[in-house]
A protein has these predicted regions:
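Single conserved hydrophobic/aromatic residue that forms the stacking wall/gate
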Residues: 1-11
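A generic structural signal for solvent-exposed, polar alpha-helical segments
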Residues: 4, 22-23, 36, 132, ...
Length: 174
């Protein structure tokens, strides 16, 4: 019930966002977490975490930045919580970025804004398309990230070829 109510609230916000004037001019993309993703996340974390903590990213925005230094300055503002993944997550999977969470108060859902440099966004998009939510070990994403950072992967085609090569050559990654 709590999850259904939360998703309903988020879809109302999506309708508002889609109809609001002037927002098209902002350099933001948004997404609403799919019901499937929300259920998977709920099952993974509940009951160990409160539902509102599990769903802190139902409504998310994505924005690009030239570098992460200005975004990190948001730490100084009271209502912002920063998740700095510029050097990887605690359980690194190759993703890089900064997630900023804003919540007006406990009665409102938080809003997540994901910031990436152009360089990281390109790689993160490929990770999301070909690796994310698959049963691959996180070391697959880390290996691909190293290849990307050493300029061995310069295109989506090369990303896919490297991924296929890694998966074909090693049972470890399956």
């Amino acid at each position: 019930p709590e999850m259904s109510r939360g998703l309903g609230d988020v879809y109302k916000r999506q309708e508002w966002y889609d109809s609001a004037e002037g927002l098209d001019d902002l350099a933001l993309d948004y997404r609403i977490k799919s019901v499937q993703s929300a259920i998977l996340k709920y099952k993974r974390y509940y009951p160990d975490h409160q539902a509102r903590k599990v769903f802190d990213d139902l409504l998310g925005f994505r924005s690009l930045c030239d570098n992460y230094e200005e975004v990190l300055q948001l730490k100084k503002i009271d209502k912002f919580r920063i998740a700095d993944m510029t050097n990887g997550k605690a359980n690194d999977d190759g993703y890089r970025g900064i997630h900023v969470y804003f919540q007006l108060d406990g009665k409102h859902y938080p809003i997540e804004i994901q910031y990436n440099t152009y360089y990281d966004r390109q790689f993160n998009n490929w990770l999301h398309k070909y690796v994310y939510k698959k049963e691959y070990d996180n070391s697959v994403g880390c290996y691909l990230r190293k290849r990307y950072e050493s300029a061995k992967i310069l295109s989506e085609k090369e990303f896919k070829e490297e991924l296929d090569h890694v998966l074909f050559d090693s049972e470890t990654y399956r």
